[in-house]
Swiss-Prot record:
Binds 16S rRNA, required for the assembly of 30S particles and may also be responsible for determining the conformation of the 16S rRNA at the A site. This is Small ribosomal subunit protein uS14. SUPFAM superfamilies: Glucocorticoid receptor-like (DNA-binding domain). GO terms for cellular component: cytoplasm; small ribosomal subunit. Binds 1 zinc ion per subunit. Coiled coil: none annotated. InterPro entries: Ribosomal_uS14, Ribosomal_uS14_bact, Ribosomal_uS14_CS, Ribosomal_uS14_sf. Belongs to the universal ribosomal protein uS14 family. Zinc-binding uS14 subfamily.
Amino acid sequence: MPRKGIIERWKRPKKFKVREYTRCSVCGRPKAVYREFGLCRVCFRKMALEGKLPGVKKASW
């Protein structure tokens, strides 16, 4: 979970609209974020394996 100060910084209005980027809603990681879920790949995998994401199934072939 990101620190309180970091969360407050995210909420502030941005100087430049172009510089906005996605962050994981759970841990705050800026890279490898799935827009549809708002989660990074690490949190997505963890939550999917725990069954917390409905409709997500592990693929095997």
